[in-house]
Regions:
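GG-anchored amphipathic helix commonly corresponding to the ABC/SMC/Rad50 NBD signature/C-loop
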Residues: 49, 267-268
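Extended helical coiled-coil dimerization/tether regions that scaffold
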Residues: 2, 99, 181-267
Length: 268
């Protein structure tokens, strides 16, 4: 399985940070601070780093889904003069140290915006590209040679998703491929519609074409969801997928057999 954990992020002329490094824990990180202190800045800098992984795909992830540095991300500073002009500091750079691939090797790379209205570039080579191209080749063969390839989980969950589902109306017919989940995965308004439709399709195809025998992928996803809620579930409770609910197919099944969609449960 490929490991991909961000270990360090360094911001140089990125928004309000002139030169700041953050060392991250591989399991969980919590940023606390007042409004405007830079919490979201660090999260979106991590998004720029994750964009480097998506940029390594040449076939299966279109470049429009890669999160880049924007011109407005460059740090602004006021010149001490009679007219107090606001200048843009450059270059704007996000550097990263990360654990990568099955050997858990440490890699480093940086993404740079050199000038206003320019394009985000790599400060050197993308160290993930060779491995990703090998994955794409195995996927393209369509001969199960990619069976042992377990792709990294990459997802940005911004608070913007709470009031607007940016890809709710995304329409895609046919069976979703294993890389389709990377589409919109770094969007600030990313929703769960694609994931829910993938689960729904797995079950429907199993009924229609596999004599009702559930695919292993469906069982693994359901196990993973239950594992995530393990400490919160009471005896006899479990998480199920139920397509009877339009907006939310994840539901809680109580020990008495009552099925409650997640949208009916309180945030507490």
């Amino acid at each position: 399985m490929c490991e991909f954990n961000i270990q360090e992020i360094e911001l140089f002329n990125y928004r309000q940070f002139e030169d700041k490094k953050f060392v991250l824990n591989s399991r969980m990180n919590v940023f606390a601070g007042k409004n405007g202190s830079g919490k979201t800045t660090v999260l979106e800098a991590a998004n720029v780093v994750l964009g480097a992984y998506l940029a390594a795909f040449k076939t299966y992830v279109p470049s429009r889904f890669v999160f880049n540095i924007k011109s407005t991300d460059a740090r602004r500073k006021t010149q001490i003069s009679d007219d107090s002009r606001i200048l843009t500091a450059g270059p704007c750079k996000v550097s990263c140290k990360a654990a990568w691939n099955i050997d858990y090797e440490s890699i480093g790379f940086q993404r740079v915006l050199l000038k206003q209205d320019g394009r985000t570039k790599f400060g050197g080579k993308n160290p993930m590209q060779q491995t990703v191209i090998e994955w794409e080749s195995k996927i393209a063969n369509a001969d199960h040679s990619d069976e042992e390839v377990i792709l990294p989980l990459v997802l940005y969950l911004s608070s913007a998703r709470l009031w607007k589902d940016g890809n709710k109306r995304t329409v895609k017919t046919g069976v979703l491929s294993r890389t389709d989940a990377y589409s919109h995965c770094l969007d600030a308004q990313h929703g769960l519609d694609i994931a829910f439709r993938y689960i729904d399709t797995l079950k429907a195809v199993a009924v229609e074409e596999n004599d009702g025998k559930i695919f292993p992928a469906y069982e693994v996803i359901l196990w993973a969801v239950n594992e995530a809620f393990r400490d919160e579930l009471k005896s006899g409770e479990k998480i199920i997928f139920s397509t009877k609910y339009e907006d939310d197919i994840i539901a809680l099944k109580t020990s008495e057999g009552t099925v409650l969609p997640f949208q009916m449960l309180s945030d507490g």
